[in-house]
């Protein structure tokens, strides 16, 4: 229980027993209690300090992995080693493919308790240039290690694609609008899918009438609600519309232009949209 000054002060004042020795002993006990509390607080704060691994990689890149451990949730040593190995290997693979990847990258790993099984128990976001947050669900069947083995590499490929392209929450290089967001998320999704072989159908599949969804988002105002149209649930029951349409856009652009995902990754969103709408509009994937 946290020390409550009001409750303890009240108990001291309520004790009216005379005697200097009794008052002296109470002072000693109070000082001792404060010392114990101070030590506990110091240890607790030390336990919550994030632990980091600085990794110097062959070539131009450097990678820092930070594990944020709390008092109740965190990573075991084996989990940290597994995550470090997977992130390191994925970083090297992505860097060989995307030459605009920042030289220095910081990955922060945290444990969450919410269900993200739809993407294999691992999710993430590109917070700022060179900075990525990766969340591991402790609720995933098999735990953090199972989630990491099945989905971490795919998540790193996805989020590092955002870093290479400049699609970050802070320092974003792109304008507003759902079509732009859909293109950038679609590029990262297809990139990760092609190079890791991992595909989460429940999260990214698109329907046969995806072309209609594309026209729908193209007609949206630039300030359309991001959650409703990208990663949340639409009032009509559809979910993750922008992510699904984004994957469709990229598949269409590849089919119509013959360009690879790496070539498309160097193009502006409006150019990719133009390629996606070119030709007969046949469905791919």
Regions found by a protein language model. Give the residues of each.
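Bacterial signal peptide processing site
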Residues: 44-46
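Post-HExxH zinc-binding segment in Zn-dependent metallohydrolases
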Residues: 176-212
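Short pre-active-site segment immediately N-terminal to the catalytic Zn-binding motif
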Residues: 138-155
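Active-site recognition of the HExxH zinc-binding catalytic motif
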Residues: 154-167
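Pan-zinc metallopeptidase signature
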Residues: 221-285
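Auxiliary, metal-adjacent structural segments of Zn-dependent hydrolase domains
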Residues: 82-131
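C-terminal motif of bacterial Sec signal peptides marking the signal peptidase cleavage site
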Residues: 39-42
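Acidic/histidine-rich, surface-exposed loop or edge segments in extracytoplasmic proteins
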Residues: 59-78
């Amino acid at each position: 229980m946290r020390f409550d000054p009001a409750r303890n002060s009240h108990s001291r004042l309520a004790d009216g027993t005379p005697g200097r020795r009794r008052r002296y002993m109470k002072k000693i006990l109070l000082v001792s209690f404060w010392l114990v509390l101070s030590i506990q607080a110091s240890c607790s704060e030390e336990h919550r300090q994030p632990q980091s691994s600085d990794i110097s990689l062959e070539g131009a890149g450097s990678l820092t992995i930070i594990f944020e451990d709390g008092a109740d949730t965190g990573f075991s040593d084996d989990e940290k080693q597994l995550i470090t190995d997977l992130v390191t290997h994925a970083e090297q693979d992505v860097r060989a493919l995307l030459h605009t990847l920042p030289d220095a990258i910081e990955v922060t790993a945290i444990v969450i308790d919410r269900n993200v099984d739809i993407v294999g128990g691992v999710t993430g976001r590109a917070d700022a240039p060179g900075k990525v947050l990766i969340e591991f669900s402790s609720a995933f069947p098999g735990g953090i290690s199972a989630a990491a083995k099945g989905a971490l590499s795919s998540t790193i490929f996805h989020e590092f694609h955002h870093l290479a392209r400049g699609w970050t929450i802070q320092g974003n290089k792109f304008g507003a609008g759902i079509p732009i967001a859909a293109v950038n998320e679609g590029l990262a999704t297809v990139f990760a899918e092609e190079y890791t072989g991992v595909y989460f159908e429940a999260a990214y599949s698109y329907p046969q009438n995806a072309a209609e969804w594309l026209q729908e988002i193209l007609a949206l105002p630039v300030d359309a609600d991001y959650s409703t149209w990208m990663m949340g649930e639409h009032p009509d029951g559809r979910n993750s519309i922008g992510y699904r349409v984004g994957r469709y856009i990229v598949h269409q652009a590849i089919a119509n232009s013959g360009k690879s995902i790496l070539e498309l990754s160097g193009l502006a969103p409006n150019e990719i949209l133009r390629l996606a709408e070119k030709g007969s509009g046949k469905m791919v994937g």
